Amino acid sequence: MQSTMAQAIRDYFSEPEIVADIVKELNQEIALCTIFRNLKREYDHGVTDAPLMTFRELNAEDRNEVFVYLGRLLESVLTCKLSLRRGFKVSKDRNSSGDVVINDIIWEIKGTTGNNSWTGSTHATKKEDDGMNFIGVKYGINEDTKVFDIINGVEGLIGEIFIGVFEKLNFVRKGSATQSNSRTSLLISLDDYDTVKEQVCWGNFRIPQRNGKYLQLEPA
């Protein structure tokens, strides 16, 4: 039953029009995030030359805030998109950030800009150490897009996307909690390639070069 539903989710997120709608909605909504709104306000008051600034040129703190906002958008956009698919009973799991319940089965949703990993959290170690039902996205970011083109809808922050729907996935966890960092990296072993390559909806896995151990995420 679960494998049938997982494949139904994959089929849904493999439809070009659905993927295009997801990217479009993310691009429209991210233009409203606090960082971009602040830049527009500051430009309107003549205290910044933001129209000449590319996304790549934002400082690390501002970029991180954009990506955090994008992650929360992703959870909502995918959950609502899934609710439109006939045969899916979808609800938000309010007990755990990022979780969606589809036909009584819990799935985790995460997005990343990393080459081969998603960000986990040490408070979720038990869940992430077990096999997870996981919808994983990588954003293909247009780094050289001008910030004001994003704000004005001339060009989207996201140009491409990777979507995978992974059933009972066992991640490799890297990193541990420190006084200043409670985050860990969730990676997919090269050994799992034959299994997970069939679970990609949009984009591809890339096999790492030079004896790399973890699969790389390639948006399309």
Please provide the spans of the model-predicted regions:
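Short hydrophobic-acidic sequence motifs that mark active-site Asp/Glu residues
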Residues: 106-108
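Nucleic-acid endonuclease domains
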Residues: 1-101, 111-220
